[in-house]
Design a protein with these regions (language model features):
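Non-catalytic alpha/beta scaffold blocks inside enzyme catalytic domains
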Residues: 1-204
Length: 205
């Protein structure tokens, strides 16, 4: 099975960058970021934050302030960011880490310069698509209700981030805009790819 890995890789690169990925440029392999360490997992990212080596963090459906054992270190790390964006159906401790609540969150709010943007997202029951779990179940589900208020689907939120970043690169250029401006984004509605489109693409459409 894995003897077909080169074919899988080419299929992936063509799905990502379409006509910009050719045999002549090694299927745009140079577009992919290369690891200089074994992995950039969430533990390493927070360590880099604490060292002042990470300026922006998108926190999607994750409450780091409660997930990690060293709350003080996580707060210190978040305080060193220039920008924190949280995407979550609920207001989390991470999204409000800068607020002083006495013994529950004793921080110096005035000393924290991190800009925090909270983007309300839908919860799983308001979304459509695939669910997997540790029991290896793969289930497709449909929304039970519309997201309340200003909450949006994660796909809509991430699409808006991508489209705006791409527009900035197209207008202003940059050090290496090619992976962003050449990214394939040929969905029926560019503002909100459907779960069906995404599932087909991941399966090698």
């Amino acid at each position: 099975y894995w003897q077909n890995y080169p074919k899988f890789m080419v299929s992936f690169m063509k799905a990502m960058w379409g006509d910009a990925a050719t045999a002549e440029n090694d299927w745009a392999y140079h577009y992919l970021p290369k690891l200089d360490v074994p992995a950039y997992d969430v533990l390493r990212i927070f360590e880099m934050m604490d060292q002042g080596r990470c300026n922006i963090y998108f926190c999607q459906g994750f409450n780091g302030l409660l997930a990690f054992p060293d709350r003080g270190k996580v707060t210190r790390a978040l305080s060193k960011l220039k920008l924190l964006v949280t995407i979550d159906p609920l207001e989390t401790e991470t999204s409000r880490f800068w607020e002083n609540h006495g013994d529950h969150n004793d921080v110096d709010t005035a000393a924290i310069q991190t800009e925090v943007i909270q983007l309300p997202s839908s919860c799983f029951a308001e979304d459509e698509g695939a669910l997997v779990n540790s029991g290896r179940w793969l289930q497709w589900h449909w929304p039970g209700a519309e997201p309340p208020g200003e909450a949006k689907l994660d796909t809509w939120i991430m699409a808006q981030v991508f489209l705006r970043v791409r527009d900035l690169y197209l207008k202003e250029g940059g050090v290496f805009p090619d992976p962003i401006v050449n990214l394939t984004w040929d969905y029926a509605d560019a503002n909100e790819p459907t779960p069906e489109e995404l599932a087909k693409e991941m399966n090698g459409r």
